[in-house]
Amino acid sequence: MAEDSTNQQTSEQGQQAQFAIQKIYVKDLSFETPNSPHIFNQEQEWKPEFNLQLSNKNQRIAENVHEVVLSLTVTAKLGDQTAFLVEVHQAGIFMLNGYGEESLGSLLGSYCPNILFPFAREVVADLVTKGGFPPLLLAPVNFDALYAQQQQQRQSAGAAEVRH
């Protein structure tokens, strides 16, 4: 009997909390090869240094509907020359209904970027290859850890402000 009551509560909670992907799209992208065509005539082996910068932001666009934008900037340098620079703003529109403030923050700051990253990675790989360079496959990113780190930094900053 107690088991039935627990299952019913779980079922009701599951019905209340709803998550749906409404749309995934490229909001903005840029590919630059500032040192072409000379970068292709290099005699040195292709072993560039890569720099990846990630950020994400979100905004509420309607009741229970949010846009999340994952921004990636990848810079490849060969020696002191920039081989290429890729910037992608991969976006998604998500319907989130019935979540508490903490859960909503985690979904928008971690779960949604996790959904968007494979799409952004594909755009980066495609642009780099079409730009005449060897394929670039970005490693997976732990957005849960990044979100936790960001929350910890916010709490530390808040605690520092209170002390002053």
Swiss-Prot record:
PANTHER family: PROTEIN-EXPORT PROTEIN SECB, PTHR36918. It is found in: Cytoplasm. Transmembrane segments: none annotated. Disulfide bonds: none annotated. One of its GO terms (biological process) is protein folding. It holds the Pfam family SecB. Coiled coil: none annotated. It comes from the Bacteria. One of its GO terms (cellular component) is cytoplasm. GO terms for molecular function: unfolded protein binding. HAMAP family: SecB. Keywords: Chaperone, Cytoplasm, Protein transport, Translocation, Transport. Homotetramer, a dimer of dimers. One homotetramer interacts with 1 SecA dimer. The gene is secB. It comes from Nitrosococcus oceani (strain ATCC 19707 / BCRC 17464 / JCM 30415 / NCIMB 11848 / C-107). This is Protein-export protein SecB. Belongs to the SecB family.
